Amino acid sequence: MDVRQLRSLVTLVEVRFSVSRAAECLHLVQSAVTQHLKQLEAELGTRLFVRHGKRLVGLTEVGEQVLRHACEALRQTGNIVAVGREHLEEERRRIRLGATHTQARYVLPPVIRRFAAAYPAVELQIHQGTPGQLVD
């Protein structure tokens, strides 16, 4: 089971069981959505959909339960992605700079002041040491 299958299920229900509209919403071809749904049913070993001929017209009782869990799983997946993006944004706002003691004392102070004024959201971390220490 994967996120694509769960998204296909949730989207299908949102568009009232129209596979073509679900595919359009997901920017997929119809056969991909159909495949996701078949794979999901196969993995779970049960029917999730009420069918009228070949058409999907509703969810079975198990399908309703799976839908609730799928919605929660997708919400949690969104939270995980948000945490990752927040961390990435924090990393993008941090610059680590290595400098010798002389550079840190005499060269960098005016440069750091100008940089901090121009980019207040960026955190500068200055590490001082000998050239050999800074390589590590």
UniProtKB/Swiss-Prot annotation:
Spans traversing the lipid bilayer: none
- Sorted UniProt keywords: Activator, DNA-binding, Transcription, Transcription regulation
Q: Which residues form the HTH lysR-type domain?
A: 1-59
Which InterPro entries does the annotation name?
Answer: LysR_subst-bd, Tscrpt_reg_HTH_LysR, WH-like_DNA-bd_sf, WH_DNA-bd_sf
| Pfam families with a match to the protein in the record | HTH_1 (PF00126), LysR_substrate (PF03466)
The DNA-binding region ranges are 19-38
- Please provide, alphabetically and separated by semicolons, the GO molecular function terms listed in this UniProt record: DNA-binding transcription factor activity; transcription cis-regulatory region binding
Family, similarity comment = Belongs to the LysR transcriptional regulatory family.
Q: What is the protein's known function?
A: This protein is a positive regulator of gene expression for the cysteine regulon.
Q: What is this protein called?
A: HTH-type transcriptional regulator CysB
